[in-house]
């Protein structure tokens, strides 16, 4: 089934989750996933011309719930609260913010915990996917909604990788892009830390080769450990030392089996993830990050970026040790539609793109200004 074969569907009510059927998807690898469903939420009204959509793309463990309180279908508050709404950077009196849950995820979209055609969870049968596959699924979902061109795509981290694949792979479908805290390809450092996280999950006996969903046991210990390691790469070194130094946790004594304060903090982060995320999705999405390379099949990174005609804003975080500024500088130097790297000062590391909402909000406004100008040129 091609994108044009999918019957037109409708956006959900504002803030509610809608499930969009996109049919079968052939992946970059050649594998096929049948009966793909993509979860979406939206804020703001779709214009009569369907040309005011801003697609918001989440990071590894995010979902479609970018703003608002917890509720049915979304157990945590919005992960980018304040970014979309009346008078917000994505001003919903003018723009229609649409957020998807990524292919391979576990908050409504098809992933390892979803049921396959035989009525059993996909589990280990779920194929490896790429960032391009994720974007193909999003493009198909929007097409099913009758949206064939969007004003802008906005994302950080894995969402930034998706935004990059949008502007490079679908330049006729997007007028501007915001690429935050991301690079053109996965680095050795990223792959090293991420494959170690995957190894922690798979070393848990309850992983059961990925087919644990109907056994009553899940690789919770492995997922906790993976999240603890990942969270260290998300935060800034100075921030962590300022908050925790080498302090004990309360009255505990590490020399007598107690914990350090930072140790307790990381354990808490691991516990929080268990309540809302599937280990199989964590593995699948992390593998997608490992294989991220915008230059694959396009003549290399430089050729792929130089050929992109879409106006973009590229932003990086000063203290980001997972995606250091040199990676965003490369994007800014090679993308013809970029007017220079925008640097966000922050002590919060990679997570600065989530925390520094005022600075990031200004980058979003700049991106939408580019979308306006590009729209005028295309008319």
UniProtKB/Swiss-Prot annotation:
Which residues constitute the catalytic centre?
Answer: 157 (nucleophile), 320, 350
Q: What is its EC number?
A: 2.3.1.31
Q: Which cysteines are joined by disulfide bonds?
A: none
Location comes to: Cytoplasm
Question: Which positions in this protein are listed as binding substrate?
Answer: 227, 351
Asked whether the keyword Transcription is assigned, the reply is no
The organism sits in which domain of life? Bacteria
Query: What Gene Ontology cellular-component terms does the record carry?
Result: cytoplasm
Q: Which UniProt keywords apply?
A: Acyltransferase, Amino-acid biosynthesis, Cytoplasm, Methionine biosynthesis, Transferase
* Catalytically driven reaction(s): L-homoserine + acetyl-CoA = O-acetyl-L-homoserine + CoA
Domain AB hydrolase-1, by residue range, is 52-356
Keyword Nucleotide-binding set for record: no
A GO molecular function annotation here is:
homoserine O-acetyltransferase activity
Which pathway is it part of? Amino-acid biosynthesis; L-methionine biosynthesis via de novo pathway; O-acetyl-L-homoserine from L-homoserine: step 1/1
Pfam families on file = Abhydrolase_1
Q: Which GO terms describe its biological process?
A: homoserine metabolic process; methionine biosynthetic process
Q: What does this protein do?
A: Transfers an acetyl group from acetyl-CoA to L-homoserine, forming acetyl-L-homoserine.
> Which NCBIfam families would you find in this protein's record?
homoserO_Ac_trn, PRK00175.1
Indicate the quaternary assembly: Homodimer.
Q: Which family does it belong to?
A: Belongs to the AB hydrolase superfamily. MetX family.
Q: Which PANTHER family match?
A: HOMOSERINE O-ACETYLTRANSFERASE
* Name of the protein described by the UniProt record: Homoserine O-acetyltransferase
Recorded source organism is Mycobacterium tuberculosis (strain CDC 1551 / Oshkosh)
Task: Give the lineage.
Answer: Bacteria, Bacillati, Actinomycetota, Actinomycetes, Mycobacteriales
């Amino acid at each position: 089934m091609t994108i044009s074969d999918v019957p037109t569907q409708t956006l959900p009510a504002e803030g509610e989750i809608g499930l969009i059927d996109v049919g079968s998807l052939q992946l970059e690898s050649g594998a096929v996933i049948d009966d793909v469903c993509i979860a979406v939420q939206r804020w703001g009204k779709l214009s009569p011309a369907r040309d005011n959509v801003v697609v918001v793309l989440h990071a590894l463990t995010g979902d479609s719930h970018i703003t608002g309180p917890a509720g049915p279908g979304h157990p945590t508050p919005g992960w980018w609260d304040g970014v979309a709404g009346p008078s917000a950077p994505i001003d919903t009196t003018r723009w229609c913010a649409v957020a998807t849950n990524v292919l391979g995820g576990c908050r409504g979209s098809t992933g390892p915990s979803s049921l396959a055609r035989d009525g059993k969870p996909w589990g280990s049968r779920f194929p490896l996917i790429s960032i391009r596959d994720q974007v193909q699924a999003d493009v198909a979902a929007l097409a099913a909604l009758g949206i064939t061109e969007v004003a802008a795509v906005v994302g950080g981290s894995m969402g930034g990788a998706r935004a990059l694949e949008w502007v490079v792979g679908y330049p006729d479908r997007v007028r501007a892009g915001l690429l935050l805290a991301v690079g053109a390809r996965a680095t050795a450092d990223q792959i090293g830390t991420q494959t170690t996280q995957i190894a922690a999950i798979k070393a848990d006996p309850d992983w059961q080769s990925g087919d644990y969903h109907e056994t009553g046991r899940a690789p919770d210990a492995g997922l906790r450990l993976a999240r603890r390691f990942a969270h260290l790469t998300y935060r800034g070194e100075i921030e962590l030392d300022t908050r925790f130094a080498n302090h004990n946790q309360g009255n505990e004594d590490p020399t007598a089996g107690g914990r350090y304060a930072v140790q307790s903090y990381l354990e808490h982060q691991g516990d929080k993830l268990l309540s809302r995320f599937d280990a199989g999705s964590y593995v699948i999405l992390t593998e997608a990050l490992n294989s991220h390379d915008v230059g694959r099949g396009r003549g290399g990174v430089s050729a792929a970026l130089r050929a992109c005609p879409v106006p973009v804003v590229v932003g990086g975080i000063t203290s980001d040790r997972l995606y250091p500024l040199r990676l965003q500088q490369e994007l800014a130097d090679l993308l013809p539609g970029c007017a220079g790297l925008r640097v966000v000062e922050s002590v919060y590391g990679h997570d600065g793109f989530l925390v520094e909402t005022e600075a990031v909000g200004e980058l979003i406004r700049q991106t939408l200004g580019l979308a306006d100008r590009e729209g005028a040129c295309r008319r």
